[in-house]
Amino acid sequence: MSDVTTAEFNEEGKYLRKVRSFVLREGRLTKGQAQAMEQQWPKIGLDYTPEPIDLVEVFGREADTVLEIGFGMGASLVAMAKAAPELNFIGIEVHKPGVGACLAEAAEAGVTNLRVYHHDAIEVLENSIAEGSLACVQLFFPDPWHKTRHHKRRIVQAPFAELIRSKLKVGGVFHLATDWENYSEHMLEVMTAAPGYKNQSATGDVVERPAHRPLTKFEARGHRLGHGVWDLMFERV
């Protein structure tokens, strides 16, 4: 599940820190996760800075960059990085055990094209990522906040869509996925109304899961139980 920060804005479109779109459940690190934090963070961890990072300097090369918001335990993100060594990947996660698990997984997989933030995703996007610098932004299985009174906590709102658009290159893609049909309808409504995007679905709604997005264990179990998953892909134009 993706867990990210606030979804409330002031009149100028600036994010406010009032409504969180995640529940902070820190949890204790396992021995392996703690070891990965100690050994791997200096190699692929990114410390938050309030100014844009230089992607060429960070990765030591020029390449298209994919950013994932809320990577959970990181298994699918590491799998994607390993499967596409020609791309740069950045993952953002607020929960430390997930970061530790991702670092351990990355070390085991031997990936060198992945960097990780343990920080608030909105702050990273607003301040650390240059405009027009990303080839793709991924938001997979964000908290659906399924109760109506909690819908304001959903991360996918109009100002958030604009923030993502500003960070994408022209032709870059915002890829969303959810296993809550109501949230997929909300996502579609927000993204269809958002200026500067084109839906990549030929039917104007959802797309089939692309081959590059790994099928998670949770998702595979859902399929066996007859649960749906909805992917949406919107291109910056």
From Swiss-Prot:
The protein's name in its UniProt record: tRNA (guanine-N(7)-)-methyltransferase
Keyword S-adenosyl-L-methionine: yes
Residues reported in the UniProt entry to bind S-adenosyl-L-methionine: 68, 93, 120, 143
Database matches in CDD domains: AdoMet_MTases
Recorded GO CC terms: tRNA methyltransferase complex
Residues that coordinate or bind substrate: 147, 179, 216-219
Described purpose of this protein according to its UniProt entry: Catalyzes the formation of N(7)-methylguanine at position 46 (m7G46) in tRNA.
Active site positions, chain numbering: 143
Organism, scientific name: Shewanella pealeana (strain ATCC 700345 / ANG-SQ1)
UniProt-listed Enzyme Commission number(s): 2.1.1.33
